[in-house]
Amino acid sequence: KSYLDYGIFQPIQIASTVALNGPQDCVKDVVQRYQNRRNVLVNGLNRIGWPVALPRATMFVWARIPDPFRHMGSLEFSKLLLREAKVAVSPGIGFGEGGDEFVRFALVENEHRTRQALRGIRKVLNLDDQEP
């Protein structure tokens, strides 16, 4: 037994090898889907006045809490978005003390639902008059 495969069920190892060495078309499709979701969210947040950088190679978007709301901390701000905008984000404090000025969006919803979320966020934040 090697250090790498100890305790890992052999059919899982074989399936992993086949997936890594096989056709990658489905990977390209998934990457494109997440890039589209990311672009809709980040571009929408920027349009409504919440500046967010475009992340690379992740299914999450980390966003610094807008200045007028930063005093709340990430937990209370997350609760505000959930209660008022019906949008769930992860409070940054859950990832350590340094994360308390941030929230994390997961790119798990389709583009239509993301646009709905942006409209709700826009109403709560009231930062800008532009549509998401």
Positions of predicted regions on the chain:
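PLP-dependent class I/II
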Residues: 1-132
